[in-house]
Design a protein with these regions (language model features):
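A conserved acidic, glycine/proline-rich C-terminal tail/linker
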Residues: 199-242
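Short acidic (Asp/Glu) patches
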Residues: 52-64, 78-100, 117-119
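Catalytic core of PPM/PP2C metal-dependent serine/threonine phosphatase domains
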Residues: 73, 146-186
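Extreme N-terminus nucleophile/cap motif
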Residues: 1-59, 200, 241-245, 249-262
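Gly/Ser/Thr-rich active-site loops/lids in small-molecule metabolic enzymes
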Residues: 128, 186-209
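Residue-level signal for inorganic ion chemistry
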Residues: 38, 109, 132
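Conserved beta-strand-loop-short alpha-helix elements that form
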Residues: 2, 103-113
Length: 262
């Protein structure tokens, strides 16, 4: 399996601390050594860094670790390959344009007997993850030829994720740069940091940061991950089938495929 990393914040924020912890799991403290990638939204633009090498050994990952890019929405991924060979075209996150915006997607899991009909969006690589992303965007494009608000789009996203989940494991992060959508099939955790801020210690490497010194009292930053990245904070664990929509660090919608949306 792979591991996911997402962030939603109300001010441009760097994710160096969380990324430093995640990259250790790419071959050092974890087995996810088959590539990594991270995408930073900057307005309508997107900075995408990818490398099929293990993140713990990647010079590109070290560059990202040293270069504090500030963003309000971030999606990251470290890969342990199961479908598709280890190469750049199979490295998450995947990006496509829809409605004049960059849509970004990362997936943790594996889908069995998954061969959707390719229409407008087609995979470049040969992973089930990219095939699912293309299928999802094809559904959205067919149902909504013109842009709609994400609240109108949510039922379609949830329905598609529910179908993918029925074919295996489907934990995912999805964004268009304005919002961050999360769907949990088996494993996902979340923490929202806001004032009063305190220190945090990474689990995978001896690094501590004092968020009080790095933030303002008005900052709200939510981090999503497959497993908790820090050892001294309380992370909230998603239940299977649970989904959430984040905007500027706050949860604006949530629910479960088993229950009605909140």
């Amino acid at each position: 399996m792979c591991e996911l990393l997402g962030m939603s914040a109300n001010v441009p924020t760097d994710i160096v601390f969380s990324f430093t912890g995640l990259m250790q799991r790419g071959g050092r403290t974890g087995p996810h050594r088959d590539g990594w990638g991270i995408a930073f939204y900057e307005g309508r633009g997107l900075r995408l860094f990818q490398d099929p090498a293990a993140s713990s050994e990647s010079e590109v990952a070290q560059l990202v670790q040293r270069y504090p890019i500030k963003s309000e929405v971030v999606i990251g991924h470290i890969r342990q390959a199961n479908v598709g060979k280890v190469c750049l075209s199979n490295t998450h996150p995947f990006v496509r344009e829809l409605w004049g915006r960059n849509w970004c997607f990362a997936h943790n899991g594996q889908l069995a007997d998954f061969a959707p009909t390719a229409t407008f969006y087609r995979p470049v690589g040969n992973t089930d993850s990219e095939a699912a992303f293309c299928d999802l965007l094809n559904r959205v494009r067919e149902a909504f030829p013109e842009p709609v608000e994400v609240e109108q789009l949510l039922p379609s996203l949830i329905q598609a994720c529910t179908e993918y989940r029925s074919k295996g494991v489907f934990n995912c992060l999805l964004s268009d740069g304005d919002w961050l959508f999360c769907f949990c099939s088996t494993k996902l955790v979340q923490i929202t940091r806001r004032a009063p801020f305190g220190p945090a210690r990474l689990k995978d490497v001896d690094v501590i940061v004092d968020f009080q010194a790095e933030t303002t009292p008005h900052d709200v930053v939510t981090v999503i991950a497959t497993e908790p990245l820090t050892e001294n904070e309380n992370w909230n664990r998603y239940e299977p089938g649970q989904w959430s929509l984040w905007r500027k660090g706050e949860c604006v919608a949530s629910g479960s495929v088993e229950t009605a949306a909140q």
